[in-house]
Amino acid sequence: MFYFPITPRLQRLYASKATARHMTWHADHEMDGDTMCHPSDSPAWKRFSELHSEFADEGRNIRLGLCSDGFQPFTNFGQQYSSWPVILTPYNLPPGMCMKDEFMFLTVLVPGPRNPKHLMDIFLQPLIAELNQLWECGVQTYDVHKRQNFQLKAALMWTINDFPAYSMLSGWSTAGRKACPYCMENTDAFTLDKSGKQSWFDCHRKFLPPNHQFRRNVTDFRKGKREVGKRFAGVRTGDELLAEIDRLGFKKAFEPGAKVTNALLSKDHGWNKKSIFWDLPYWRTNVIRHNLDVMHIEKNVFDNIFNTVLNVPGKTKDHAKSREELNDICDRPGLAKDPATGRFPKAMYALDRDSKRVLLEWIQKIKFPDGYASNLSRCVDLKGLKMHGMKSHDCHVFMQRLLPIALRELLPKNVWEPLTELSIFFRELTSTSLSQEDLNRMETEIPKILCKLERIFPPSFFDSMEHLPVHLPYEAMMAGPVTNKGRVEGSVSSGYLQEEIAKFASYYFAEGDPMLPVRLGRNETCDMDIDEDADRLGIFKPKGKPLRGSGRRYLEDDEIIAARTYVLLNCSEIEDY
């Protein structure tokens, strides 16, 4: 493995004026009403400050977030090889800085070729030891902004991971019926007889208000089942979880006999080990310790919706096994097998061939603003009537911006509406600022949205990814608008170190020095010409550079109107009017 100590890099943040003056932003800024724009506005951050006041009193002490994810560096060569970087991010910086590449510090690089799984803790031992040292003793650091030495300390606030990595770091198994780390043993998930898969169908009525009509419905959910009086058990504290792990006898992955002991205990419990993060003395007091990765959940939800609506063979959740047991679970005779033909009828949420072609041809023609999204037309397969090769950001854009428009004329209103509500939910949840009022509303609305979807889609549609959104508002409420995890894909130790050295050295240049790095916009170059004509509107001063060969054509009337509108909306000179 490769380990890059975090302490010297945290000290370097105070060695340059470009960063040192921003390191107390979290303590100096004032929250705008009940709107959270940074993790420091969150209840989890404030609770940590209350419990550890000595640490919080020094605003220069650093609070960190950790993320880890695997990647395949040799996918183009067909070789199975998985590497796992572990990245730390300081949250002291303002929102516009803390998620930039130069402030995402690669600390551990676990080599392949295999996924380390629950043995990940073995590779995290030096990091946890260093974090304990930074918490208990700290390190003397020179603050170039205040021109004084101080004892720098650091604390890990939480981790942010996709679902498989969540299990590796937290010790809670994210596979099987107890996969949800919030419901835990109190889950209502069940195993489908035909496919053997776990289903979270009809697991969301307990989150509804006590008098909601869905709770008494015995036809649209599981047959004859009411959810009267049942409620979500609530989120357990770190002290409660640690006490349970110790009572059951789980061991850390690197302790003697851990493999056999943990394997036996995990057969009857949701835990698979005692996480190494419990070695941090403050970890049990953290309000939230492991965050779900919203982008990962959103992508999986989108894939399930889109593949089911397009009825993609092998990927749709509405397959023969699902239909065979559908009416054993819920009352939907209209989707039962036709005894005369032996076939299952088309569901109202599935598109016919003509509608699929209309949808995919529309996607091929979509044009986005430069840098907004990738070219989705490359993902369209008109021959197979499906989409392929969509990345997480492609799914993110499609789910939040295109899905309601794309399906509005193609699906019945009772199907389109809850899908649109789910799209709006993800759009609001991933906004850069969140108000308490909006989060309370989202926490109330998401169970209703999921229940509406349960009245439409089959039980096989609802895997753990369709269930997890019900817990996302709570995480956002506790931790604030935590930006999506960073990923240093394809980085190797030598190349990463060279890049980090170059970035850090650049911060030693004086302010105003032309060699200080400036992030240019897309399609900009250092030698871009600027027209200094005072009478010319600001939007026309930069001289454009063509991206490809030139041509000539006349604009249509609607194109002229669109161009004029864009200019009027983006000229600072006319804002007063």
Segments from the language model and where they lie:
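Compact, glycine/acidic-enriched structural inserts
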Residues: 85, 91-139, 208, 214-217
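Acidic, metal-ligating active-site segments
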Residues: 43-50, 55-104, 109-111, 185, ...
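Beta-strand-rich globular domains of non-transmembrane regions
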Residues: 15-16, 20-24, 65, 73, ...
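Contiguous, well-ordered alpha-helical segments that form the cores/surfaces of helical PPI scaffolds
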Residues: 72, 85-92, 385, 400-407, ...
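Domain-level detector for long, ordered catalytic/regulatory cores in large eukaryotic signaling
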Residues: 1-49, 59, 114, 135-389, ...
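Amphipathic alpha-helical scaffolding segments
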Residues: 81-89, 103-106, 124-129, 196-203, ...
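A short acidic (Asp/Glu
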Residues: 75-79, 120, 168-169, 193
